[in-house]
C-alpha cells in the first residue's frame, strides 16, 4: 500500500535531573557540594533511507518519544546523554509543524538528517549553585522538558519527468515501454492510483527518472478525485510530459483536455507552469487519430511543439525521449519553496512570543499564568526543596510576574495557577 501523507507525534527526551549531594570523605574537611548535572535528553532525528518508498510504516507507529537523560550523581558525576532516537523516512519527505504549518525539513538525499524535536538540557546539580555566601546550597534543577510537537509528513516522489493527463490516455503504457517499470495497465479509469517510477535510457548514454502519476480530472486542484494527493508529486519534477488521447474513443475532445489539465496545474501551484512541458499526442495508431491531431494543432497554434506517438507500437517514442533528455540538460531544478517562505519559516522557529507570559482569571477568581518561559522554569524547579522554591519566587519576580499580578488586583491569599498546580500569592 502506497502512503504519502501521515500525521505523527514526536517528543525529545527530557533532560536528567541535577542532584543535591555533598562530599563526605575521610580526610576531606569541608568537602562542599558534589551533586552532578543531569544528562541531555535525546533528540528525535529524521534520517533519509534510500530504500524506503512510502510512509506506510508510520500508519502503525505514530508516537515517537526519545529517552530522557541520565540523572546527575554524587561525587560530581554528570548524567549520561541519551542516544538520539533515529526515525527513517523515504527520500522526498517534507516535515511540517501541524500547528503552525512551518516547514521543518525537506529531506531528499540518502542519509540526510534533520532534528525534528530537540531533547532538553540536563538540570544543574547543587555544585553549580555554590557561592561565597552560600557554599553548601540545598538546590538542584530538574531536567528541561524535551521539545514536543505534532508533525505532518508529506512524501513527494523524486522524479525528473512527470507524466500527466486524464485517466486512460496511455501514461502507464508509455512508461512500461520506455523503462523496466511494470505499472498496472487496464481498460478502465484510475487503474493507476499510486505513482510509478521508471529509469529511462535514451540510447546515447543519457538517462532520467520518469514518474507515471495517477490521472487528473477537472477540479483536481481543489481536491476532487484525490487531486491534492496526485498533484503534490508533480512539484519535484523538472519537465512535464502532457499525454493526450488522440483516438477520441473516450468521447473527449483533445484540446479541451489540454486546456483543462493545464488549468488544474496552474490553480494548484502557479509555479508548475514555469516547467517545460512536452505535449504528446498518443494513440496515433487508432483510425481517427490523424484527423483529431490536425484539429488539435489548428486550435493550439504553432507555439507548442507536439510529438505524435503510439505507446503500443512505439511509433515516435525515440524522438520524444531525446527531446525530454535535451530539456533536462538545460532545465535547472526548481526550488520547492520561495526564499521568502524559507526566511519566514526560520523566524517562526524562534518562537518570539515564548519570552512573554499571559495572565488570565477564572470565574472562581484564580489567576492562571501561562507562557513558554515560566512553564519551563516551573517544570525545572524541584519543589521538594525550600531553596528551590525561594529561587523560583525570585525568578517570577525577575520576569515581572509579581508586578503584573498586583496590577490585575492580586492580594495576599489569592490562588495562582501554573499548569495543573496551585499556590497562594504572597504580597
Curated annotation (Swiss-Prot):
Keyword Zinc: no
Ligand binding (GTP): 165-172, 190-194, 212-215, 282-285, 310-312
Subcellular location: Cytoplasm
Binding site residues for Mg(2+): 172, 192
UniProt-listed Enzyme Commission number(s): 3.6.5.-
Transmembrane segments annotated in the record for this chain: none
PROSITE patterns linked: G_OBG, GTP1_OBG, OBG, OCT
A single MF term (Gene Ontology): GTP binding
Entry keywords, A to Z: Cytoplasm, GTP-binding, Hydrolase, Magnesium, Metal-binding, Nucleotide-binding
Residue intervals of the Obg domain: 1-158
Chief location of this protein within or outside the cell: cytoplasm
Keyword Metal-binding on entry: yes
Residues in OCT domain copies: 349-427
Swiss-Prot/TrEMBL cofactor(s): Mg(2+)
One of the GO BP terms on file: ribosome biogenesis
Domain spans labelled OBG-type G: 159-329
GO cellular component: cytoplasm
InterPro entries listed in its UniProt record: G_OBG (IPR031167), GTP-bd (IPR006073), GTP-bd_Obg/CgtA (IPR014100), GTP-bd_prot_GTP1/OBG_C_sf (IPR036346), GTP1-OBG_CS (IPR006074), GTP1_OBG_dom (IPR006169), GTP1_OBG_dom_sf (IPR036726), OBG_GTPase (IPR045086)
Biological role: An essential GTPase which binds GTP, GDP and possibly (p)ppGpp with moderate affinity, with high nucleotide exchange rates and a fairly low GTP hydrolysis rate. Plays a role in control of the cell cycle, stress response, ribosome biogenesis and in those bacteria that undergo differentiation, in morphogenesis control.
NCBIfam families: Obg_CgtA, Obg_CgtA_exten, PRK12296.1, PRK12297.1, PRK12299.1, small_GTP
SUBUNIT field: Monomer.
Official protein name in the record: GTPase Obg
Organism the protein comes from: Bacillus mycoides (strain KBAB4)
Amino acid at each position: 500500500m502506497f502512503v504519502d501523507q501521515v500525521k505523527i507525534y514526536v517528543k525529545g527526551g527530557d533532560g536528567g535531573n541535577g542532584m543535591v549531594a555533598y562530599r563526605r570523605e575521610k580526610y576531606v574537611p569541608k568537602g562542599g557540594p558534589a551533586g552532578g548535572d543531569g544528562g541531555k535528553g535525546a533528540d528525535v532525528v529524521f534520517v533519509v533511507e534510500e530504500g524506503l518508498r512510502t510512509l506506510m510504516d508510520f500508519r502503525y507507529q505514530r508516537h515517537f518519544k526519545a529517552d530522557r537523560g541520565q540523572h546527575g550523581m554524587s561525587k560530581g558525576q554528570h548524567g549520561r546523554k541519551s542516544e538520539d532516537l533515529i526515525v527513517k523516512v523515504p527520500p522526498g519527505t517534507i516535515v511540517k509543524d501541524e500547528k503552525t504549518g512551518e516547514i521543518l525539513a525537506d529531506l531528499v538525499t540518502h542519509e540526510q538528517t534533520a532534528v525534528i524535536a530537540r531533547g532538553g538540557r540536563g538540570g544543574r546539580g547543587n555544585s553549580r549553585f555554590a557561592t561565597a555566601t552560600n557554599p553548601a546550597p540545598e538546590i538542584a534543577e530538574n531536567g528541561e522538558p524535551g521539545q514536543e510537537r505534532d508533525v505532518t509528513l508529506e512524501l513527494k516522489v523524486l522524479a525528473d519527468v512527470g507524466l500527466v493527463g486524464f485517466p486512460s490516455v496511455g501514461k502507464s503504457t508509455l512508461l512500461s515501454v520506455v523503462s523496466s517499470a511494470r505499472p498496472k495497465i487496464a481498460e478502465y479509469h484510475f487503474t493507476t492510483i499510486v505513482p510509478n517510477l521508471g529509469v529511462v535510457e535514451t540510447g546515447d548514454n543519457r538517462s532520467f527518472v520518469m514518474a507515471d502519476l495517477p490521472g487528473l480530472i477537472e477540479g483536481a486542484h481543489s481536491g476532487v478525485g484525490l487531486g491534492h494527493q496526485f498533484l503534490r508529486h508533480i512539484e519535484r519534477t523538472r519537465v512535464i510530459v502532457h499525454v493526450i488521447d488522440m483516438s477520441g474513443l473516450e468521447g473527449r475532445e483533445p484540446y479541451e483536455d489540454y486546456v483543462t489539465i493545464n488549468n488544474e496545474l496552474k490553480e494548484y501551484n502557479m509555479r508548475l507552469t514555469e516547467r517545460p512541458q512536452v505535449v504528446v499526442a498518443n494513440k496515433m495508431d487508432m483510425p481517427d487519430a490523424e484527423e483529431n491531431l490536425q484539429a488539435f494543432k489548428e486550435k493550439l497554434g504553432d507555439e507548442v511543439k507536439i510529438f505524435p506517438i503510439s505507446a503500443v507500437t512505439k511509433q515516435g517514442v525515440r524522438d520524444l525521449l531525446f527531446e525530454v533528455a535535451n530539456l533536462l540538460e538545460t532545465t535547472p531544478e526548481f526550488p520547492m519553496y520561495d526564499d521568502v517562505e524559507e526566511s519566514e519559516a526560520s523566524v517562526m522557529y524562534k518562537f518570539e512570543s515564548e519570552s512573554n507570559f499571559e495572565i488570565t482569571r477564572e470565574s472562581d477568581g484564580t489567576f492562571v499564568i501561562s507562557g513558554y518561559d515560566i512553564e519551563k522554569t516551573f517544570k525545572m524547579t524541584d519543589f521538594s526543596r525550600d531553596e528551590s522554591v525561594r529561587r523560583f519566587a525570585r525568578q517570577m519576580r525577575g520576569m515581572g510576574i509579581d508586578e503584573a499580578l498586583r496590577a490585575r488586583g492580586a492580594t495576599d491569599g489569592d490562588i495562582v495557577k501554573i499548569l495543573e498546580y496551585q499556590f497562594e500569592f504572597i504580597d
